[in-house]
Amino acid sequence: MRFSFFSGIRDLFRHLIISATSGALSDRLGWLWAVIARVFSGSVWLRHKIAKSPHQVQATVVSVGNIVVGGTGKTPLVLWLAQALHERGLSCAVLSRGYKGKYSKKKAFTIVNPALHTASCVGDEPLLLAKYLPSGTVRIQKDRKTLAEKSAGDFDVLLLDDGFQYNRLHKDVEIVLVNGSDPFGGGSFFPKGRLRDFPERLAKADYVMINGRCSPSDQRELDRLHPEEKIVIEPQISEIVWLNQSVNMPRDHWEGLGVGVFCGLGFPKGFLAMLRDAGIHVLGTYLLPDHVGITKQELELFCKKIILRQGVGILCTEKDSVKIGALAEEISFPVGEVRMRFSCVCNERRMVAMLDAIEAIQKNKRVTT
């Protein structure tokens, strides 16, 4: 019961971010956000304090998480990790809570199938992962301990998506991803800032990865909290695919491209900066809260706005694309998804060592079970 209580508090606070970042309203209610942030940090401390001994399963459990509310680029990392382990001959499943998906509340787990499910059913991130990973390997259930128990016999490795704060399951490897431009979520707990956990808990992570470059002061603080070498990654555009056009856009056509951009991300500034770094001219934006999809009316109005500014199309992330589904085909103005992958720009040797360590743990478990 207490875990449902804490989950309910977390969901409520995440929902409040819509109001907490709304300009003048946020300024007027700053005192309220500070009070709620104090309560939230207390609930986080209490949850860690009363956590019981975690349950162990026979498969190797690898957690990928963060310490802030959204916006670190965790989904592309989970995708890369699952594919990298698969290339090493390890069977791997992604276990997700299925946040914002109505099927996550079912007593039985759901195997995500892009041909059958929508983002409203299973959540946008699990649906996106299932688009690229082998059939049957992305599973959702709110009770991830039970989900792990039911999946452990079928896979070598279980990737626990957003698992750093999940205390009910033993994790063999803890990976934490932080955003290089704001690794500590503004220095305050949500909703005053973006923290969802204490930065000091980075000491418990086996590997800390940084998405983008840090300022020297943030890098020093990260090194103080987690002395081991950090792995630095950077997202890059791999391709732009039009959802309602018969042709795609060659890379040499990106320079100077005038577009509108809509997205529902925890940290949209990073996505917009990546587009601008690629030479794409952003004529206007329509920003939604994390995990929230755009409606047909909103998209049509935004398209008209960008047409008036002489734009050639609308771009969104793949996470937004899976939420709109076939809606793009009802729009005559070009709508495209930006496909991203990351590259390791610092300490690739440690990233390979991380994969080696996961493989070694799995082999040892196989021998002892």
Swiss-Prot record:
Pathway assigned in UniProt: Glycolipid biosynthesis; lipid IV(A) biosynthesis; lipid IV(A) from (3R)-3-hydroxytetradecanoyl-[acyl-carrier-protein] and UDP-N-acetyl-alpha-D-glucosamine: step 6/6
Enzyme Commission number, as recorded: 2.7.1.130
Keywords (A to Z) from UniProt: ATP-binding, Kinase, Lipid A biosynthesis, Lipid biosynthesis, Lipid metabolism, Nucleotide-binding, Transferase
Gene Ontology biological process terms from the UniProt entry: lipid A biosynthetic process; lipopolysaccharide core region biosynthetic process
SUPFAM superfamilies noted in UniProt: P-loop containing nucleoside triphosphate hydrolases
Binding site for ATP: V68, V69, G70, G71, T72, G73, K74, T75
Name of the top EC class for this enzyme: transferase
InterPro entries reported for this sequence: LpxK, P-loop_NTPase
Molecular-function annotations in GO: ATP binding; tetraacyldisaccharide 4'-kinase activity
Disulfide-bond pairs as recorded: none
Family matches, as Pfam families: LpxK
Example of a GO cellular component annotation carried by this entry: plasma membrane
Known role: Transfers the gamma-phosphate of ATP to the 4'-position of a tetraacyldisaccharide 1-phosphate intermediate (termed DS-1-P) to form tetraacyldisaccharide 1,4'-bis-phosphate (lipid IVA).
Similarity remark: Belongs to the LpxK family.
Official protein name in the record: Tetraacyldisaccharide 4'-kinase
